Amino acid sequence: GDAINYSFNVSNFRPAQTQDPEPGGVVGFNFCSYTDSFGPGELIAANGIYNQWLDAAVEAAGTETPYFYTIHEPNFETPIPGSSAGSYDYAFHHFWDSEESRAQGAALFAETAPAPQGPQPDCIQELFLFDSYPFRSPQI
């Protein structure tokens, strides 16, 4: 078959605060679509609230984290053939240094994150998780 390259624009991100001492980790993807009342501006505002929560969690823990996220906007039409993600406007990409830190972060988020307010995007509820090994270290 033909090799196909799918490229994305990274429109928004939160960098890691510290480098992961051991390569590899866990990545997760949420695939989301904008709605009539939730567009790119609302996404940036929602990420601002998420960043505030992350800052408070890091401060409470007293240690920096290698967790980071990026918002990937496809430079191609979705869905792609054979994809289970369906059609989407952006992929919310998370990186954790381990499954343990991902599970701890998810539990903390479930317990302490502010409830969503106002319009929300249409997202696939299932988080697509993969083991990861970076080709290069993210810049800090």
Regions of interest found by a model, annotated:
Residues 1-140:
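Short S/T/G/P-rich N-terminal loop/turn motif that feeds into the first structured element of a domain
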